Amino acid sequence: MASVLEIPFYDADDFHLQANIEKMKQGISLQDVDRESWLDTLTNNLAKWETAAGAVLACSALKETYRTVLQSGVENDVTWVYLYGRSKLIKERMAGRKGHYFKPDLVDSQFADLEPPQYGWHFNISSSSDYIVKSILDKLRHTD
């Protein structure tokens, strides 16, 4: 998506504190308090990216409160794209991420915390990535 739009891509996982990464490596779920500094960092970066050309941020943003914090850092509305899928498929994809610290076993705890957004564009990840990217681009063109 980012390469097609010619803007930077960021993975929110890259902004976690080392202590949180260690917890996840051990299979320990993060709590809201663990995510506070991570959300602050992402919010500050969103403001910087907004003043540049924009960016694509891949971020779990599991709860509405997290999304509210992230939106608060920018002047314009965030274009929210919610990618959803079955736990089994997500675990399979997580297991295929070589060298990533997040254990597929933690997916269940994320599903337990998940508050799906009632807004934005929703896509099932069982669709091809090409289809999802094309659909998002079509929606972006019709939003301007």
Predicted regions located by residue number:
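Conserved nucleotide-binding/hydrolysis micro-motifs of P-loop NTPases
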Residues: 16, 61-63, 85-89
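Glycine-rich phosphate-binding loop used to anchor ATP phosphates in small-molecule kinases
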Residues: 33-75, 83
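Small-molecule kinase domains that catalyze NTP-dependent phosphoryl transfer to phosphate-bearing small molecules
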Residues: 96-137
